[in-house]
Amino acid sequence: MVFCTYCGHSFTRDEHLERHILTHTNVKPFKCFTCHMSFARRDLLQGHYTVHGRNQDQQEIPAANGMIPKSAGRTPIACSNCAKTKTKCDKKFPCSRCASRNLRCTLRPTLVSTKNAARMGLITPETIAQDIANGTLPPDQTVAAEKVPLPIAPTGHVEESSKSSSPSGSPTSISHNSTGSDAPPAPMFDQFNGCPTPPQGLSPTTPSGQGFNGPASFPGFDDYNQQIGKTSAEDCNLHFMLDWQQLQLPIGLDPMLQPDMLGDQDLNFDMGAMGLGTQMEPILSINPELTNNMPPPLITPIETPKFDRSSSDLDAFSSGLHDRQYSVVSNQSVDSHYQAPPQPDPVVVAQDGWNVFRCVPSVHPSACPSTARWNLEALESTLQNHDGRSKWRPEVDENLFDGSDQLAVMQIHESTRDKLLAITQGFLHKALEIHRGNEAAQTYAPSNFVLLPPTKVLEYFLRSYTNSFERFYPLTSKGSLDANELMFCYQDRASSLLILLMVAQGAMNVPSREARSLTGGLVETCRISLFDLIERNIVMASDHNVLHAALIFTELASWSGDKWQMDIAMGQRGMYAAMLRHSGVLDRTTYPPQGSFSDGQTNADHMWNLWIQQESRSRPVYSWAMVDQELALFHGASPLFSVTEFGIALPHNEELWRAKSAGEWTSLMGQRVSTTDSDATASPPSLRDLSRRFLDDEMDSAECFLNPMHLRLLLLPLQAMVGHYQQLMCCFSDSGSSRVKNKTVTASSTRCRLEEVQCLLQRWYNIAMDYLKEHSVCSVMQASLVLYHLISLNAVTDFVQIERLARRETFDGTYQSLVWTHKRCITDVGEAIFHCGQVISLIRSMPRSVRPPWWAASIYRVALVLWCDSLIDKDGSSSYGGKSGQTFAVDALPSDHPLIQRYLNKGEGTPRLSKRDGSTIGLDHGLTVLNHCAEIIDEGATSRFQEGIRGKLDRLMRT
C-alpha cells in the first residue's frame, strides 16, 4: 500500500497514486501543440482543440452546420432575439433569422454565468434591460454601462488614451480594508472569493457581442481592442477564448501560494512560456483597478512585485503574516501602494484575560479574541511557505545540549518524515474544517499541501524537547529517542500525535515567528485529533503513547501563554485524569516471576523486556501526578489525584530506565544487589505505601531506596494538606491577626494542624538534604526543592488575597486597612522572605534552557509576596523589624548559613536581594523589588508565557 505525501490518502496500486498526485502538484502533462497550453486531463485537451479547429494531428475539425464551437466550456444556445420571441434559432453567428431581418444578433450568456454575475453584483445585458424597464437606467446610458473607459491608459499608448480617458487619470492609492477579526487575514486568493471585485467608481461589464467570451471581465480589454483597431466581429485573437483557470503558470509559481511567497526574486514570469506572447503585455500593464481586484494567481506584472516586510515587538509572529507593505512597480512609476495597518497579536491581547496570575485588573473573557483558528491558519501559512521552510535554520546553541544525562535523538529517516507528513496533512485539514465550518467551502480555496520543516530542524526540536521535558518527566526508555521506531508501530496515528507534540514542545523555547506558529498550530491540531482518537476507540485511553501525548499537550498548553489553550488545557485536564483513573492503570501491578541474572543472556533479555513494560505503565501515571500537582499549586486548587489512589509501583532509578541493552541493565541491577540487602528486581513501593512510611517516620529503613522522583512525589500529599488547611483558615475572620483575642476552637485547631504540616515539610527537607549529600543534584531534584519552598510559602501567605490587594480590591486607601490586609496576606514575614530568596537562588542556579515550564510563575509569586511586604513600614515592635545585625543576601546564601538561621530564629539582620553584578537591593521599595524580579525573568529563555508574566509585572509597576 502506498500513501499520498500531500493528503495521506492510501492507494493499492502505483498508477492510481501517480494519477492522484497530479491533483496536488499542478502538473499538467497534456499539452496543446498550437498554443502550448497544458491540461491535467486528456478530455480537457480534446475539448480545447475545438477552439483552434484543429486536432493534435493538425487536421481541421469540421464545424457542425456552421455552429459556434464549444469553447471555454460553453454550449451554444439561442441568441437573445430568438429567445425573446421564442423562435427557433439555428445557433449560427449571426443567426439566419437576425440576418434576414437586419437585426443585431447578440449571444446570450448561459444560466450559470448569469447567476454568477448576479451573485457578484456585475452588470449583465439582462440587468440593463430590467433597469431600463424599471426606469432606473435611461436608455442613453446603456452604452456607458456596457463599456466604461479606464482612468489609466495601458503602457505604450499613454498619449492616445489620455485624450479619451477620464479626467482623473493619475494613479490613486487604494488600501485594503482592514478587519477587526482576531483570526489572521485570509490568504489573498481567499479574500477575493475566487472572483474579481469591481473597483470603486467603475462599473464592470459582462462579455457580450462586443466583449470576449471568458469567465470574467477584466479592466482594459475594451480599450485595448479600440487602440489596436479591431471590432469584436473582426477580432479573431484566440487568446481571448482561453480558459484562464487552465493558464500554465511559470515554473516555481503555485496559484495556492501565500502572498508572502511571491517575494521570491528568482521567480520567472515568462510571458512566452504561458502561451501569451507579446500581445498581452499592454493588457497586463499594472493599474490600480487590475491590481486591486485580481487574485494573486492571475496577476502577472511586468516586474516582480517587491515586498517590504516589517515586524513589531508586540507581535512576534503576525508581523510576518499581517504587517506587510506591497509596492508594485511598473515600467513608468508606482501605480498603487498597499499598506496594511498593523494588527496586534491576539495571544498578546488576551493576556489580560488570563484566569490565573491576575495581579492587574482582568478583562471579561468575551472581550478576549479566540486564537484557535488564528493558530491553525498561522501554521498553515507557515508550512505552505515551502521555500522559506526549506531555508529556515533556527539558531542552534550546541552548548544547551551538553550533559551526561541528555537523551540521544536518532536521525529521522526520509520514509518516517514522509509518513508523518501524510498523517499531519489529514490532522491539519480536519482541524481547519472544524474551525472554519461552512465558511471553508464558500470563502476558502482548497488547502494546498503543506511541508514539515526540514529533517535537521525536526531533529533540533526533538533535542530541545528532551532537554526541557524529559529531564523533569522521564518517559523515554533506552537512553534514546527514535522517531522512526515510534512511527512504524501498530498505532501510527497515536505515534504521529506524540511526535508532533514533541516537536511543538521543543519549538516552544525557540523565540522565532516560525517556531511559535508551529507550536500554537500543532497544539490545537493535536488536541482535536487526540480527542477524536480516544472517542473512536476507548481502548486507546490506556495506551502508553496516548497517555504520553495527552501529558505533553496538557503541560504544553497550560504554560503556553495563550489564554484559549490555557483554559481548555485546564478543562481537559479533568477529562484525562478521569480517563487515567477509569482505565485501571492506577491499580497495583506486580512483576511476573523472574529468574536470576545468571540464567543466561536469553533470560536477561526477557527480564529486561518485562521490566521495561512495567516501567512504561508506571512512569506515565506518576508523571501525570506531578503535572497535576504543579497545575494545582499555581492555580490555587486541589490536586485531582489523591495519594490513596496510587497503588502502582513507583518508578526505578533513571540509570536503569536509560540502560541501552540487557547487559547494561543486568550490570546495574547487580550493583544495586551488592549495595543493598533488598532484592534489586523486587517491585518498588507505591506512592500510597511510601507516604505511609513518611508519615510514620520510617524512611530510614533499608527497604526504602529513594530517588529524586520519589521525593518529588512525596510533596503531593503535603501540598494537598497545606491547601486544605489554608482554605479553612481563609474562612475565619482575620486569620493570623493579633487583634482577635478570642479565636474559636476550630480556628486554633486548624492553625495547629497547619503547623504540623510545616513540621512534615521540614522533615521532607531534611531527607532531601541527606540525599544530596550522597548524590549529585539533578533537574528533578532542583524542581522538587523549588516546589518545596513554594508549598512552604503557601503555608505562611494567602496568595489570593495578595493578588486582590494588587488589583486594589481589598484596600480602601487608609494605612490601617493596609496593615490589616498585610497581616492577613503574610502571617510569618521571616519565613516568607526566606523561602522567596531560596526560590530565586534555585531558579538562577538552573541553566536557562533547562528549567521547568513554570519557572516564570514561581518568580511571579516571589515578586508579589515581596512587593506586598514592602508596602508597610517595619518598626521595632515587629518580629522582623530590622533589629541589630548585618545585611545579607537572602537569595545568595544556603539555607543552613548562620546569618539566615539567626534571622529566622531571632529576627536579626536585614535581608536583601543580590544582582548579577554583585550589588544588592533592599526589600523596602516595591517598585525596586518588582523591577528586580522582572530582570530575573528576562535572564531565562524567551517564551510566550514568560513574556506574559513579564508584561503583568510591568503593568503592576505602572499602577
From Swiss-Prot:
Source organism (scientific name): Elsinoe fawcettii (Citrus scab fungus)
Subcellular location: Nucleus
Ranges annotated as DNA-binding: 79-105
CDD domains documented for this protein: GAL4 (cd00067)
Deletion consequences: Blocks the expression of the elsinochrome cluster genes RDT1, PKS1, PRF1 and HP1, and impairs the production of elsinochrome.
Keyword DNA-binding attributed: yes
Compositional bias (Low complexity): 163-178
Protein name per Swiss-Prot or TrEMBL: Transcription factor 1
One BP annotation, GO: DNA-templated transcription
GO MF: DNA binding; DNA-binding transcription factor activity, RNA polymerase II-specific; zinc ion binding
Chain's gene name: TSF1
